[in-house]
């Protein structure tokens, strides 16, 4: 059993023991397993009637998730001290609980320089414009070949274990959003090599107001004890009036949903689950597919939106598509998945233009087909 597994198990095992440890570590005691409550109540009243309370505010701003010991020394004799042994230096997570596996990711983000032991992609994909901001999808892509596999003693199973963390911080450095996932995998040992040819992809939607932020991401290989982390500027523009257009992304695959549709996840259109292909490399073995969403302006209901997709190579237009748009779905969006009309390897730029009435929206992205 791994350390983080033990921590998670401890959250639910023997709650009375946990209460006792909490009480004693904070200078109190637990009343339990007794019908005689006179003595413990007398002790409580003595403590309430005659005591001094001291508070301690740490001066260090280094929130490294480590345990910091506290020691209280008295100049007078005959006094009894009730105090906790110390505290964990945890940052404010925007009101969200801190999970055991996230502590190691926070330590990676606190390192200088940031660790780079793993190759991964982490992108916040922009989707629906909303009043004051926009909806996004945070996507991680980690090649399975980056992870260390532990084979059991009988060589029957292989264990791989990755953890992901993304923090969104405002200009004051305060955490306003957290996205994380712990993904252990146990697979048959004879299928390991094929499994390592794929990628571990994790995506989660989130909403954010317009502004300038810092996006911090970390990925952990729990079996090897290695990590990688990045920090970047993240700017959210206020929504423009008129028809809207999401970011454009390459599609790794589209799978039929085997669970109820999640209307708040823009990567689940019309009963499918879109797995993005992050980075700028698309395999030439098959024509690449693009995915984006159009958001019609309800005030222009008489005019239907129209989309034009242009492909450029070395500044010259080499292909153009004008797909017919279906009606908007229940969320008011028009998801578009389009097979690019490209065959020759090379570097391409894609430009998407959406028009509805007098309003227009534009988007672009570039990739290598090789």
PLM region spans:
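Scaffold/interface architecture of coatomer-like assemblies
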Residues: 1-370
């Amino acid at each position: 059993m791994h350390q983080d597994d033990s921590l998670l198990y401890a959250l639910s095992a023997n709650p009375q023991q946990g209460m006792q440890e909490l009480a004693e570590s904070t200078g109190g005691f637990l009343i339990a397993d007794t019908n005689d409550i006179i003595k413990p109540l007398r002790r409580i009243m003595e403590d309430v009637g005659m005591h001094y309370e001291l508070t301690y505010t740490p001066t260090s701003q280094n929130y490294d998730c480590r345990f910091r010991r506290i020691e209280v020394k008295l100049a007078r004799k005959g006094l009894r001290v009730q105090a906790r042994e110390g505290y964990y230096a945890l940052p404010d997570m925007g009101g969200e609980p801190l999970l055991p596996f996230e502590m190691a990711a926070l330590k990676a983000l606190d390192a200088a320089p940031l660790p780079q032991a793993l190759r991964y992609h982490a992108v916040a994909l922009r989707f629906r414009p909303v009043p004051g901001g926009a909806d996004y999808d945070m996507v991680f892509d980690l090649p399975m070949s980056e992870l260390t596999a532990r084979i059991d003693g009988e060589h029957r199973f292989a264990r791989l274990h990755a953890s992901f963390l993304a923090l969104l911080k405002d200009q004051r450095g305060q955490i306003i959003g957290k996205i994380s996932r712990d993904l252990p995998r146990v697979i048959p040992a004879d299928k390991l090599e094929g499994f390592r040819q794929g990628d571990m992809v994790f995506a989660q939607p989130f909403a954010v107001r317009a502004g300038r932020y810092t996006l911090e991401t970390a990925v952990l290989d729990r079996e090897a004890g290695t990590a990688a982390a990045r920090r970047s500027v993240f700017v959210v523009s206020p929504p423009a009036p008129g028809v809207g257009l999401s970011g454009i992304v390459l599609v790794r695959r589209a799978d039929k949903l085997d669970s109820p549709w999640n209307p708040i996840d823009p990567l689940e259109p019309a009963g499918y689950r879109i797995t993005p292909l992050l980075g700028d490399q698309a395999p030439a073995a098959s024509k690449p597919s693009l995915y984006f969403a159009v958001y019609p302006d309800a005030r222009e209901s008489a005019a239907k939106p129209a989309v034009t997709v242009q492909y450029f190579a070395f500044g010259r237009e080499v292909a153009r598509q004008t797909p017919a748009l279906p009606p908007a779905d229940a969320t008011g969006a028009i998801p578009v998945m389009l097979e690019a009309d490209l065959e020759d390897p090379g570097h391409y730029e894609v430009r998407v233009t959406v028009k509805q009435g007098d309003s227009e929206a534009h988007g672009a992205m570039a990739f290598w087909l090789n």
